[in-house]
From Swiss-Prot:
Subcellular compartments: Membrane
InterPro entries, per the entry: ALMT (IPR020966)
Biological source species: Arabidopsis thaliana
Taxonomic lineage from the root: Eukaryota, Viridiplantae, Streptophyta, Embryophyta, Tracheophyta
The protein's name in its UniProt record: Aluminum-activated malate transporter 8
Any one GO cellular component localisation term in the record: membrane
């Protein structure tokens, strides 16, 4: 008994002795987690400081005596507005600020009107009329929140409308200064909302539209990364490291990105024109592209199942389809990288994308030829090659899906006014033309051959661009369709 008591006592003192070191380790671990969280997105720290600035500015309604005399305790509504309205992005702040401002204005006006209307029915009829109006408008506003469009863009405004109307209408029954109360509430909310919007826009703004733009381009890059590493994943899995394998599977995050994309697109519509994005930028087109990207990610997820499966086709069959499969995955990956770069830089590079897609289609034809030449002779052979054939068919679907993504981006680029990238063929001709002008070129004039000695050598170069009909731009740059030069 004494031994157990001594052991418990020793254990207690040991825990007490270890407590400072454990506390230090725990605090250090938490500090490192906070530092890592802040480094992942430094804008979070800036946003926190911006909220602090907005709260400090709006608190002047209490600190400055003339402002306090004007607004009194209703200045608290301005502080409350800053807390609930200030969002991480400019679009989020504008959405909540404008919703709150207009909802307060409309609900306040209706509330004052409801109070004056109810007073016509006398002291006994006034609460009955107010109760009917509060019930009717409150129920109607609540029902409107179920409509998808209102739910998506004006849900917060409908909520504030219900709150403000009920507050003004019910308070008006016990006070005669209903107009003053409504004015002070509206004024302080507008002051708080305006401060939020100004701080959000002019101090290190975070644009939802820019985040959406980068997100779509990065998601397309994730698809490209997987397709470029597909050959090694499927045909040579033993040579792929764990880090590389996890890197190429980044596409999995695309499968759960729909809610984030919808939210960013909705907030981006509230934002004014900024940077490369004009006032009426086609934000809805991002959702169309995102849907196709997600569809492609679903195909890759199915494809990844065959990569991880132990049920593979015979080695002889895989060796026949390896070359077209490799070409197909590599080319379609390059096409996706070009599309992602086009979105990031907002430059239309259709020639490069078309070239890679055409190459992938040629690889599909070669794959079909290889499959026909490997037609199984027996039922058993057919069962053995099914995994390989299924994998190939899914990869063909991926190519078709990438082509749809490109078509959607091509449509989007016209609406978003992407800059045109100079065609590669025209660029080569321009470079050759400029090179000729830098060298020593002596033109051949009529009659020169008669004057000069017959032993002199001339090389007459006549350039006919037969296979290429120059556009108006090409003619302006190159000067003419036919060039005659003499190299001495």
């Amino acid at each position: 008994m004494d031994l157990n008591a001594q052991e418990k006592k020793a254990g207690f003192f040991q825990r007490l002795q270890d407590f400072p070191s454990k506390l230090k380790d725990d605090v250090t671990k938490r500090v490192k987690n906070v530092q890592k969280f802040a480094k992942d997105d430094p804008r979070r720290i800036i946003h926190s400081m911006k909220v602090g600035v907005a709260l400090t500015l709006v608190s002047l309604l209490y600190y400055v005596r003339p402002l306090y005399i004007s607004f009194g305790v209703t200045g608290m509504w301005a502080i409350l507005t800053v807390v609930v309205v200030f969002e991480f992005t400019v679009g989020g702040t504008l959405s909540k600020g404008l919703n709150r401002g207009f909802a307060t204005l409309i609900a306040g006006a209706l509330g004052v009107g409801a109070v004056h209307l109810a007073r016509f029915f006398g002291h006994q009829g006034e609460p009955i009329v107010l109760g009917i109006l509060v019930f009717s408008l409150g129920a109607a506003a609540t029902f409107s929140r179920f409509f998808p469009r209102i739910k998506q863009r004006y849900d917060y405004g409908a909520l504030i409308f219900i709150l403000t109307f009920s507050f003004v209408a019910i308070s008006g029954y016990r006070t005669d200064e209903i107009l003053i109360m409504a004015y002070q509430r509206l004024s302080t909310i507008l002051i708080g909302g305006t401060i939020c919007i100004l701080v959000s826009i002019f101090i290190c703004p975070v644009w939802a539209g820019e985040d959406l733009h980068k997100m779509i381009a990065n998601n397309i890059n994730k698809l490209a990364k997987y397709l470029e590493g597909f050959e090694g994943e499927y045909f040579q899995p033993e040579k792929i490291s764990k880090e590389t394998s996890s890197c190429v599977r980044e596409y999995k995050s695309i499968l759960t990105s729909k809610s984030t994309e919808d939210s960013l697109a909705n907030l981006a519509r509230w934002e004014p024109g900024h940077g490369r994005f004009r006032l009426r930028h086609p934000w809805k087109k991002y959702l169309k592209i995102a849907g196709l990207v997600r569809q492609c990610a679903v195909h890759l997820e199915i494809l990844n199942g065959y990569v991880l499966s132990n049920d593979k086709a015979p080695q002889e069959f895989e060796s026949k389809i390896q070359e077209p499969i490799t070409t197909m995955s590599r080319e379609v990956g390059e096409a996706l990288k070009a599309i992602a770069k086009s979105i990031k830089t907002m430059r239309n590079d259709s020639a490069c994308v078309n070239a890679h897609i055409d190459n992938s289609k040629k690889a599909i034809k070669n794959l079909k030829i290889a499959l026909k030449s490997s037609y199984p002779e027996t039922y058993k052979d057919l069962l053995e090659i099914i995994p390989g054939v299924t994998m190939a068919s899914i990869l063909i679907e991926v190519v078709n899906c990438v082509e749809k993504i490109y078509e959607a981006v091509e449509e989007f680029s016209g609406l978003a006014h992407f800059k045109e990238t100079l065609d590669s063929k025209l660029s080569a001709e321009i470079g050759q033309h400029q090179l000729l002008h830098r060298g020593c070129v002596k033109p051949v004039l009529d009659g020169d051959n008669e004057k000069e000695d017959n032993s002199s050598c001339h090389v007459l170069i006549t350039v006919h661009d037969e296979g290429y009909l120059p556009t108006a731009t090409a003619k302006n740059v190159l000067g003419a369709e036919k060039t005659r030069v003499d190299i001495v």
